Amino acid sequence: QSDEFWAGSDIYLSGLRLQNMQDLYLIHCYMEAVNRQNMPLASFEFQSGEADYDESGNGRLDVSDADFTARMCIAQNNRLINHYLFTGGRNMLLKKPRKDGNNRIAITGERHGFTAPVNPEGKLSYTYDRIRRSTRVTLANACRLAAMQEERDNVLVGFIPDYFMTEYCYPGSEREKKMVQHLTRYRTGSGWDTFAKMLLLNHYAFGGVNLQEDGSWMEKKAVLFLLSADYMDAGVQERLCRFVENGGSLLLYGRMPVM
C-alpha cells in the first residue's frame, strides 16, 4: 500500500444504538489493521442527513445522531470526518440521451441530496444546527483531539483481508460458490453481534491487527480474538502459532481452520 494513499470509510448506521454499536467499533479496528502507521483513521462518507433517501418519510434520524456518532469516532482515533451529503444540489442532464426516463448523471433524478443538512434549495434541515455546533466544539479542541490516543486493554482483534475478497467468484464453479458462502457466514456472523458486543459492554477497549502481515502484535502478551473459517492461509496460521509461542493467548470464534 502506497504511503500516499489514504483509506477512508463509508459509515451509514442510520442511528447508533445498542444493536449496532459494535459495527462502528469494528469498522475502526479493521481499518486500523490495514492502514499504515502514518495514516490516521478517516471517514470520507459520514452519514449526516435525515436518512429519508427516497423522500417518502421512510427515515428520520434523531437530531443528535451525527453528533453522537462523530464523537464516538473521534474517541476511537478517527481524525477526519466528511459529513456526507452535507449540501444537496441538482444532477445535470447527460449530453447523450439515455432514454431511461431520467437522463441524468445520477439515478436519483434532478434533485440530489434532499435529505442533507442543506437541501438542494438551500433550506436548512433540523440536523444542521447540531452538526454546526459539534463541529465548532471539535475544532476548538483540535490540538488536543489530534494528539490523543484511545486507552486500550490487552486485547486484540485479528483481521484477515482475504476473508472479505469475495465480491467476485467464477459463476460456473460450485466449489467457489460454497467457499464464498462459507467465508461470508464465518467472517462476521454471530461473532460481531455477540462476542465483540460483549467485550464492549464489559468495558474492554481493543485494537485491530492485520494477520496477513508480520508486526509487533506477534510479540505482545495479549489476548487475540479472531473470527475464523475453515479456510485460512498458511502464513496466517504460522503467525498465529508464533504469537502463541511468544506468550500470547488465542481465541478462535467460529471454525477451526482445516485448509
Task: Give the location of each predicted region.
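Aromatic- and acid-rich polysaccharide-binding/catalytic face
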Residues: 2-22, 48-49, 225
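Carbohydrate-binding surfaces of carbohydrate-active enzymes
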Residues: 25, 33-55, 59-259
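Extended hydrophobic/aromatic segments used for targeting, binding, or gating
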Residues: 5-9, 27-29, 33
